[in-house]
């Protein structure tokens, strides 16, 4: 394995370890040694790959965002997807986002922690703003291709991302028996498809 591949794999191992740690306790209470222990590496290794604990968090955000962008690109460029109508393609994308992001309690728990950190950490806030702006722009571009009212596609994109974030928060607070998440998500998609 090439040195750069080993480096990338080791960094990914450490980022996944941070995710594991954040399932158990807050970022503030998580130490470099905790992350190293979960990653099964000496804590000195973390300092080789990352400048600080905050740097691990910032790179973790990039890692998650890049992974989901890659998965969305795979959906968009899947050989069968190009034959789908705009509405059916949006249904596929929404189904993916709903399952992989909105209803993923583990990921939501981690990002709630990151949102809290962003209140006090400008670098984390900037990283989140950038990530959300990218999501909004991707949906704006896709909505413009199929929506009748292109002047409002950007607003619709913001509403969609904000709705998903709200549902993500709800999915960590409410149990499935208390709130029918799938029904709410399906109705939201129906409303969007009506405008296409």
Report each predicted region and the residues it spans.
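N-terminal intrinsically disordered/low-complexity leader segments
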Residues: 1-9
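Helix-turn-helix
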Residues: 13, 21-59
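Short, basic, alpha-helical segments at the C-terminal edge of helix-turn-helix-like DNA-binding modules
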Residues: 32, 62-69
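Residues in soluble alpha-helical coiled-coils and helical-bundle/repeat scaffolds
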Residues: 51-55, 80-84, 98, 102, ...
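Hydrophobic alpha-helical connector segments
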Residues: 59, 73-103, 156-160, 182
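Short alpha-helical scaffolding segments that buttress acidic/His motifs in well-ordered protein cores
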Residues: 93, 97, 111-115, 160, ...
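Amphipathic alpha-helical packing segments from all-alpha helical-bundle domains
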Residues: 103-112, 119-147
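Hydrophobic/aromatic-rich alpha-helical bundle segments in the mid-to-C-terminal region
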Residues: 125-129, 145-196
């Amino acid at each position: 394995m090439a040195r750069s591949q080993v480096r990338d794999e080791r960094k990914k191992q450490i980022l996944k370890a941070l995710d594991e740690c954040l399932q158990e306790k807050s970022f503030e209470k998580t130490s470099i040694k905790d992350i190293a222990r979960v990653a099964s590496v000496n804590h000195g290794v973390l300092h080789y790959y990352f400048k600080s604990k905050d740097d691990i968090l910032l790179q973790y955000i990039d890692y998650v965002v890049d992974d989901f962008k890659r998965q969305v690109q795979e959906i968009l460029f899947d050989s069968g997807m190009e034959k789908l109508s705009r509405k059916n393609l949006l249904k596929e994308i929404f189904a993916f986002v709903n399952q992989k992001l909105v209803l993923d309690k583990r990921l939501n728990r981690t990002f709630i922690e990151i949102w809290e950190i962003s209140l006090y950490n400008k670098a984390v806030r900037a990283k989140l703003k950038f990530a959300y702006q990218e999501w909004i722009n991707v949906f704006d571009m896709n909505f413009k291709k199929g929506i009748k009212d292109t002047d409002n596609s950007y607003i619709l994109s913001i509403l969609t991302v904000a709705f998903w974030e709200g549902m993500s928060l709800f999915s960590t607070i409410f149990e499935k028996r208390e709130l029918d998440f799938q029904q709410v998500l399906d109705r939201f998609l129906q409303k969007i498809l009506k405008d296409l």
